[in-house]
Amino acid sequence: MLCLVCGVVVAGADNAATVATLGPFDARFVVRALGIGLLLLVVFLIGERLMKAPGKTRRVDTFPVLERYRSLPFAGRLLVPSAVMLACWTPVIVIMYPGTIWYDTGDQIAQWYGIEAYGQPAGSISSHHPLLDTIVFGSLARLGDALAGDYRSALAVYAVVQCVVMCVELTGVCLYVARVGREGAAHMAAVALFAFFTLFPALVIFMMSIVKDSLHLLFLVPWLVLFAETARTRLEALHSPRFAVGFVALSVLTALTTMTGLYVTILSLCCLPLTRAGRADRLRALAVASVTALITMMVFPAAVRSAFDVEYEDQNQLLVVPMQMTARYALDHPGDVTDTERAAIDRVNHVPFEDMAFRYHPYLADPVIQYSLRDPSGVGEYLRAWAVMGLRHPDSYANAFAALESGWFSLQRTPMNVTDRGIRLDELRGIAGQAAANRIRFQIADAISPAFARMTRYHANNANSASRSRAYALWGFWQSTPVLRVLTLTALWTFLLPAFLLFRLLRPPYGRMLARCALPAAYAAPLVWSLLSLLANAISVPLKPTASRYMLWALVVVPFMLALCASERSESTCQMKGNSR
């Protein structure tokens, strides 16, 4: 049944990502949904069989190199594979040096230099992006100016250091899998995980990017390991004060480096007290969540506000999806709106209702909703009008949401990459037969914002343009090579592999334990909340690399979850306490 549901979702998402409607639900749709569902069932069963295969336990003394490696202290066992991974990443690091500046990063740095961005007054810092990221990137630029007379120099060093640190962290993830899983299978899973992290170029390409999401990943990876250990030991890991303090520190840093990271981190921490454990242990977990929320939502904002001129934005980002639905309603039913509803919409949004149909872009909310609201006090009135209109024509809302978020579920997408205007539905239908595969798209060349271009010492980095073209060619090779290109599909990471994890959870022995366990797989909470957070984004189809940037955390989180699942001990997850070696 799960595979059939997945087939229906993918078929509907393919329609939404190519023609901006879920239907038509005709015979072709049924055949495609059944075909995808059957294929997924076969693949999932094969994957399950591979995961259940007993790993071979080899005697260490038969491999002298392995024996010497295992005799090393922990630091050696961590750094030696990290050096191997870094050596494999080095060619990409070289061709992408000095790192990619993203559009948003340029705005953040420009603000640190007192240049106006996002319509905010010059000299102020906008809260449109996480303040910690702005402080980090701006301080690095200032450091480069002070030490080398060029702000780009410190950012280039930062990009390389970011890659080095990530190699160490990913190696630590592999060592953790090898330590906590069943003997034999755990080592095989760890080796497979290490090979993926080492050879798949998406990770190193992204880590050579200077952007808030790559900084976030630096804290997310070790936080995931601590979260998994806390869940695996049924909260007993929190008995260690050093572990608990480190967990809180990483939770705070993970939460402060992306907007969605704040909610994902705190909501995940709130799941830990639900674990079947002692009352004292649950209180410790609740304390971790409470302290993290207090620091990230009250202490840090107050401290930054006292030190810098921060311009706090209204909550326009919370209305991205509702306003996109309103725009689709304006396109489908322009005459079926009351004067009161029209006034409520026009009061809140800069784009009036009468212009929404023309500006509507099925795969991008930016043309409809701006960086701010016209009158934030009218949000309540707007939401009431929005609800009434949705009850009147729910089909428009469903198609608007499906099109906007279809990129997380679809295998195909429209070949159009237009972002500076609205797109008519007849345009999409006219080129639906040229649909392209929905693949991860990277920002490799610099994306320079107008504010960043105004910096007096800014100069385009053309010296490395030839090398960066080789980075594009490398990713193009992976996108076009049979078998390898499957790994470049967005939906593989944001829907299909998570669906496989759910498939494993519902199958024996997990299925029999769901009634007895509060959280049979508590360590999956970050994955669940992260996936749900994707559904509030203003773009999912990669018309521009921003869409792919939102999901690149999945390239670490999903393989980590798969490795834990493949190497889990034979004891039930209800008895995982005490599994550590």
Describe every region a protein language model picked out:
Residues 2-14, 32-33, 74-102, 199, ...:
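Transmembrane signal-anchor helices characteristic of membrane glycosylation enzymes that use polyprenol
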Residues 153-160, 404-527:
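Membrane-interface anchor segments at the N-terminal boundary of transmembrane helices
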Residues 160-183, 222:
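Transmembrane-helix motifs of polytopic, lipid-linked glycan transferases
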Residues 113, 215-235, 246-247, 251, ...:
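Specific aromatic-rich, kink-prone transmembrane helix
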Residues 96-110, 120-140, 148-153, 553:
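Extracytoplasmic catalytic/substrate-binding loops of multi-pass membrane glycan-assembly enzymes
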Residues 243-258, 290-296:
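Membrane-interface alpha helices of multi-pass inner-membrane proteins
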Residues 1-4, 25-91, 522, 568-574, ...:
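Start-transfer (signal-anchor) and selected internal transmembrane alpha helices
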Residues 309-461:
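Membrane-proximal stem/loop segments at transmembrane-domain junctions that anchor or position
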